[in-house]
Amino acid sequence: MKKVILLGDSIRMGYDKYVKDALDGVAEVFYPPENCRYAENVLRFAHEWKAKGAWGDDVDLVHWNAGLWDVLELFGDEPLSTKDYYASVIPRIDRRLRMLFPKAKILFATSTSVIEERCKPHFRRHNSTIEEYNAIAVSALEGTGTIINDLYALTSGMPEEYHSDAVHFYTDRGTEIIGGRVLSVICRELGISAREIKLEGFEPEKYSADNIGY
């Protein structure tokens, strides 16, 4: 059976259980029981999540994202991570993941779009900034062999009703579309097939609001 790791922020927390259930019987799917937040946090804690989860060295694929926290503007300040820092830390994470999971294919997902007008005044994200940081990440990963899963392109045209708030897609259609895209790239890269998940009666992971963190 294949082994898959999902690392990422609260966007990942919206589809992780969906992916896990869809791959039941063909792949073991693991992920941290928390929001991985900004890129530096992934660099700092990836090895601890591996150890605590007992994921082992035989992982076949890692799908990860980090960026929405990096672009976050608190109280009108600049993004939490500068562009230069983000450009330097993304390839460091890539190298760390390859060290921790030497047999794994590495997939990076771009950060998803937001509804800017629904962001709180002191807690803002801008799609133009997200686009810039996504481009920085993709450029920084060139030549590494990392596969890009463009979730920004997938979500940028989504109807507002697919969103659960300014940032998240915790709706049936949002989960189905984003989870479906993640599943499709995982299945393509590992040569496996997912089973259909019916949203009626589906139960996502029960993360608390504090754990999601936004």
Task: Please report, for each region that a protein language model flagged, where it lies by residue.
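Alpha/beta-hydrolase-fold catalytic nucleophile elbow
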Residues: 65, 109-110
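A general structural detector for well-ordered alpha-helical segments in enzyme core domains, enriched
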Residues: 86-96, 133-137
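Short, well-ordered alpha-helices that flank and scaffold nucleotide-derived cofactor binding pockets
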Residues: 17, 21, 51, 95, ...
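Generic structural signal for residues in well-ordered beta-strands
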Residues: 27-29, 106, 148
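Catalytic His-Asp segment of secreted/periplasmic serine-dependent ester chemistry enzymes
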Residues: 112-214
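A short helix->loop->beta-strand "cap" motif at the edges of active sites that frequently abuts
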Residues: 101-105
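Conserved SGNH/GDSL esterase-like catalytic core that processes O-acyl groups on lipids
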Residues: 1-92, 203-214
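A general structural signal for short secondary-structure boundary/capping elements
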Residues: 51-55, 78, 110-111, 154-155, ...
